[in-house]
A protein has these predicted regions:
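A short helix->loop->beta-strand "cap" motif at the edges of active sites that frequently abuts
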Residues: 146-150
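Acidic/histidine-rich helix-loop elements
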Residues: 36-39, 82-95, 123, 210
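Charged helix-capping and loop-helix junction motifs
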Residues: 128-137, 168-173
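Catalytic His-Asp segment of secreted/periplasmic serine-dependent ester chemistry enzymes
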Residues: 160-250, 256-263
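Extracellular/periplasmic catalytic domains that process cell-envelope and extracellular macromolecules
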Residues: 55-58, 78-79, 106-108, 145, ...
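Oxyanion-hole/transition-state-stabilizing segment in secreted/luminal serine hydrolases
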Residues: 70-83, 94-132, 152, 156-160
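N-terminal secretory targeting modules
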Residues: 1-64, 75-78, 230-263
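Hydrophobic positions in alpha-helices of CheY-like receiver
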Residues: 138-142
Length: 263
């Protein structure tokens, strides 16, 4: 071996050693087989699909579907003895729910459906018009699949950390509310109950992250949704709604509106 060749081999040795050491690290860094690099919550959706395939089908349950505001809600405890199915997953956008729609739905048709999604869409840069379009697409699909179920869409909520997005959220709420009646969907205003007397989000109702609600905030949502579910006992599942208006349910009353603001 020439002196030049020996010198080159000596110079390359540290590089080869580093590369060899990096191989095990690279192997451990590989994503799980069911992980989608563009969708970090694939495991949650996979768990829903397994539950659908193996678990008992709950008849006449209330399906809650959407993002982390649904996932973090103690739905089973909050609405007992009503049978419930929680299909919320963290960080979900409306396109995510539409993409995984078939894997999220329970095997038995629900008696009622409660939807909350769209907030993360806006946080990701989507326009209010696009969010409302996707949300209406989801509501239309749910209505087509469950023609006799009652469906409620929860208005996008204000929060301390996303307060700058509130004007866009209110715009989404207005657009969806004006079109909900034709789909026989009730719009429940869950935002007003989270505001303090000064009109700003009440920080005492949120976790330290300023985004997700604490138990006190969820109790306010539970009261509203419980009131809506109790209406189900007095009306048939396919009760008629004026297609020119929508039901906006607030903490105080139900308002019929055609162009109303959720406030």
């Amino acid at each position: 071996m020439t002196g030049a060749a020996a010198g080159m081999r000596a110079a390359c040795a540290p590089i080869l050693l580093i590369a060899a050491m990096a191989l095990p690290l690279a192997a451990t860094a590989q994503p799980a087989p069911n992980a989608d690099p563009a969708f970090p919550f694939a495991r949650e959706v996979e768990a829903f699909a397994r539950a659908n395939a193996s678990g008992p089908a709950l008849r006449d349950a209330t399906l809650f579907i959407g993002s982390s505001s649904i996932r973090l809600w103690d739905i089973k405890g909050s609405f007992a003895p009503i049978a419930t199915v929680n299909r919320g997953f963290g960080g979900a956008t409306t396109p995510d729910v539409l993409r995984h729609y078939d894997r999220l739905l329970p095997p038995a048709p629900p008696r009622a459906v409660v939807v909350y999604v769209g907030e993360n869409d806006l946080a990701g840069g989507a326009s209010p018009q696009d969010v409302a379009r996707d949300l209406n697409m989801l509501l239309r699909r749910l209505r087509a699949d469950y023609p006799r179920a009652r469906i409620a869409c929860l208005s996008l909520k204000p929060s301390p950390i996303r307060w700058t997005l509130w004007p866009k959220m209110a715009q989404v709420n207005r657009i969806v509310a004006t079109r909900a009646g034709a789909l026989r969907v009730d719009m429940i205003d869950v935002g007003t109950v989270l505001l303090a007397p000064d009109g700003l989000p009440d920080a005492s109702l949120f976790n330290p992250d300023g985004l997700h609600m604490n138990p006190a905030g969820y109790r306010r949502w539970t009261r509203l949704v419980t009131g809506w579910l109790r209406q189900d006992d007095a009306k048939p599942a396919n009760f008629p709604i004026d297609p020119k208006s929508s039901n906006i349910i607030t903490d105080r009353k139900t308002v019929k509106t055609g162009q109303g603001d959720l406030g």
